[in-house]
Amino acid sequence: MNLKNANYSGANGRNSLIDLEIPEEFNGEIIIFIHGFMGFKDWGAWNLVQQFFVQQNYGFCKFNTSHNGGTADNGIDFPDPESFGNNTYSKEIEDLQLVVQWLNDKVENWNG
């Protein structure tokens, strides 16, 4: 399974982008990668990090937090600075909880 720029519903019901890659020889473990307070899922070397872990048979999920300044249509260019201004750590924790629920709906046989 390989989902790129899929949508999940994050904090306050705000849609954001998520990637999920499950290798053929999946070991049942998924790494959930969180980019940090001022970042996004496709910044820098994060795709290389994903590739490394998938080659080790881990599933890999990375996502934009719902209030990182990106949108579901444009996750990179910071088109919504107002949402970023309303971001909190609590919203990012809620996003993580919602991503785990999203994974439970998408992936069978993982140890989450």
Residue ranges and their predicted role:
Residues 30, 111-112:
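Residue-level recognition of the N-termini of beta-strands and the immediately preceding loop/turn
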Residues 8, 43-46, 60, 102, ...:
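A residue-identity detector for tryptophan
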Residues 82-111:
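Alpha/beta-hydrolase active-site loop
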Residues 24-70, 74, 78:
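Short, surface-exposed "cap/lid" segments of acyl-processing enzymes
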Residues 1-26:
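N-terminal cap/lid segment of alpha/beta-hydrolase-fold proteins
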Residues 22, 45, 92-95:
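General structural feature for long, well-ordered alpha-helical segments within catalytic domains
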